[in-house]
Structure formats: structure tokens, C-alpha cells
């Protein structure tokens, strides 16, 4: 909801920072998969309601759930100093999930040609949000919150 108020950095449809993912990836590493999933589901539903675009729930859920599954698996192999890695890989799978939904909803497999553009933006956004989550995690850990 907050991110919708920020002007797009690039004039490409579907490309955004994914600031809400900072909270989800942070929650996954700080509190575990269940809490991260709850946060993901609530923010997707609330975002769709407040944006007034109910169809976005399908794209957001597909991308978010695929991202969540992958990052839950990665969490088993990564330390809390590698949150950014999970975020980057999760962003890639988030984009794959969204493209798959777009193909199903439109019946146009040719949409897959848009995937490389989304991959580049997803990797950059995933790196940014992952570094933010990792920074937050480190600061709160130093304050004795974990």
C-alpha cells in the first residue's frame, strides 16, 4: 500500500521494489515460516482490497507463495548473514509465479518473453530488500531482540 504511493523507478509494467517483502523475509529468518506465511497472506489480501484490484491477489499469491516455499527451503542452508541471498532467489521465483499466472489468466504463453525483464528487476529488487532485511535483523539481534 505504501509502495503504491511511490513513483515507479522505471516505466516498465510490473516492476517495483517490493518493499513489503522486507517484512516477510525478515519474519522468515527472525520468527519462522509460519509467521512469515501469515504476514504474506495478510499483506496480499489487504493489498488487493485496498488497491481495489482484486485480480492482483492471484498474481501476488502465486508469486508470494512460490517465493515463500523456496525461501523456507533456503533458510535451512543459509545463515542469518545470507538473508540477501534468500531474498534474491525468492524474488526470481516470485516473478516466475507471476508469469505463470499471467499465462494461465490470459491464455498467452508468449508472455514468457517478459520474464528476462522481470528477472533483472527482480534480482535487483530482491538484493535491495534482502539487504534491508538483513540490516534490520542484525540491528535487532544486537539489541538483544533475538
Regions picked out by a protein language model, each given a short descriptive name:
Residues 1-27:
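Hydrophobic transmembrane alpha-helices
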Residues 3, 7, 28, 39, ...:
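Alpha-helical transmembrane segments and their lipid-water interface positions
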Residues 4, 28-29, 48, 72, ...:
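Transmembrane helix-loop junction
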Residues 19-33, 70-74:
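Generic transmembrane alpha-helix motif of multi-pass integral membrane proteins
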Residues 34-76:
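Helix-adjacent hinge/juxtasegments
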Residues 53, 57-58, 76-146:
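Membrane-embedded alpha-helical hairpins and interfacial helices in multi-pass inner-membrane proteins
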